[in-house]
């Protein structure tokens, strides 16, 4: 399997970057992962990296993005925080990935049976965790207002996990003028996804891609 290079990264579109990840997850679910020489990839990436996507996911030990999407060293950036919440550090990391390092896609990846989401639903208070869970509270309140309060507890948590992922995804473009500009120009795309810890499958939603502006398209074609 070929290691990501600047040339490969430059010619990828956001849509193609998404397709690579979707295909990788299908391989993962089918247990047909690509054969990679990881030591060779260590050597080939020692002088630089050209990842084509950045994935924001939870710290849950079952949700490692490189494994879920069957990617190797140097292929993707991985940002992880409980509840896949967006903060200034995450936004800064995404701005570096896309504006500086040239990544073409942002993925916000929630997952089923999320402990952080469950904690937010139960209004847990525990040290610094309290502030983190407060970032998930808007999703809890929105699901409650939509009639979700009458759902069984497990189903309510899953609804909140999905809504939280949607809200975090929208917050990225709302809070980062840099990323919003790249998106408007068609230089990056953004998608949401939910990973099933039962099946290993990622269900994607709210895929957002813009037609590249003429100048951006010409630059990518060079």
Language-model-derived ranges and their functions:
Residues 1-48, 74, 83-101, 115-222:
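Divalent-metal-activated hydrolytic enzyme cores
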Residues 65:
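Acidic/His- and Gly-rich active-site-bordering loop/insert found
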Residues 108:
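Conserved functional hotspot residues or short segments at active or partner-binding sites
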Residues 57-62, 82-85, 111:
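Short glycine-enriched loops at secondary-structure junctions
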Residues 104:
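Short acidic/polar active-site loop segments enriched in Thr and Asp
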Residues 38-41, 54-59:
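Long, hydrophobic/aromatic N-terminal blocks
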């Amino acid at each position: 399997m070929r290691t990501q290079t600047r040339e490969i990264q430059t010619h990828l579109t956001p849509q193609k970057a998404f397709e690579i990840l979707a295909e990788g997850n299908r391989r993962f679910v089918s247990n047909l992962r690509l054969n990679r020489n990881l030591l060779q990839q260590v050597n080939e990436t020692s002088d630089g990296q050209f990842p084509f996507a950045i994935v924001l996911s939870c710290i849950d030990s079952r949700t490692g993005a490189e494994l879920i999407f069957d990617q190797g060293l140097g292929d993707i950036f991985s940002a992880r925080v409980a509840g896949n919440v967006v903060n200034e550090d995450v936004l800064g990391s995404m701005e570096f990935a896309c504006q500086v390092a040239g990544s073409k896609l942002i993925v916000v990846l929630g997952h089923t049976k999320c402990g952080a989401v469950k904690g937010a639903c139960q209004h847990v208070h525990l040290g610094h965790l309290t502030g983190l869970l407060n970032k998930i509270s808007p999703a809890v309140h929105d699901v409650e207002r939509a009639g979700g309060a009458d759902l069984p507890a497990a189903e309510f948590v899953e609804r909140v996990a999905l809504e939280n992922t949607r809200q975090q995804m929208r917050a990225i473009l709302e809070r980062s003028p840099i990323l919003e500009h790249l998106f408007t120009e068609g230089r990056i795309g953004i998608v949401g996804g939910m990973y099933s810890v039962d099946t290993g499958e990622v269900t994607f939603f709210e895929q957002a891609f813009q037609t590249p502006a003429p100048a951006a398209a010409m630059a990518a074609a060079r």
